[in-house]
Amino acid sequence: MGLWEAFKRRFRLRAEQDKLLIVDGEKIMIQKFTLFQRLLHVGIFSTFIWQIITGYPLKFYKVEWAKPLIALLGGIPGEMTIHRISGFIMFSDFLLTVLYLILILIANWDLAKKDFFGYFKIVPGPTDVTFVHYIKYLLGFRKVPPDWDEYIWVDKFDFWAVGWGMLAIGITGWILWLPEVFTGYLGLPPETIQIAYLMHSDEAVLALGWIALVYMYIVHYGPNKFPMDWIWLTGTASEVEWIEERPRSYRRIIKAVAENEPHLLEKYPFLKERYQFVLEVEKLPEEEMIKKMHEYAHHLLEKEVEGRNG
């Protein structure tokens, strides 16, 4: 029983109120990622960079621009060695992530049975119908963005796309690395090597295209993020950012703090003000509610700027 309780404490989903951080007694931050989650992310993106640096010159080794890179990294053998080592680390990171998710599911099975999509918000679920509202907003048929939750559409798409991509590029990478094992011991036809090469290469092009053209703009290069969203490093987001981008999550966190730790509202009057605002704004129709929340976020930002300049 002691081991089980220790296991549950280690992998238990954080309560909503635990995501709110009070900095210097006057500033609210929201914690999105734990240290371990950030390390997993660093492992994936750092090895991905090395995969690109070494993989594309190998694919286009006859093209002039690739030759200096190949020479710099020890020729074809050197490039292949670095590519394989970084690929092995990347695939290990992926497997560790899968194990981590399984352990979280086991430790929170009671919550999963109660409300799977409510607690495991990274999984696409019924609330993702808000994506339709997002399209309407982009096309001008809606005045405000959707009432996004903790994970918006791009978070979920990128998270699960990495899973599919790692299966596709990882398995084919192993086949290309150890062709004699797969065609010899496992008895796969020789054509498997050519098919694996095409899948491995095309998946790499697809991954780089999506990350360079879509993901980087939405997550890092957008006007409100440029030059970078540092949440991958700090794990936290500002209150203003959370109100604007994930209003449903913000309201739920504030209400959870008020309901589960009411003493904090007495200790920090600004928290009580936030709670009263949330209660009032939730009485409004959705679009008007989102508009009021954005206005409130701008008000908080103006106060913060005045405080810094004053």
Predicted features and spans:
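Membrane-embedded alpha-helical bundles that constitute the cytochrome b-like, heme-associated redox core
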Residues: M1-G310
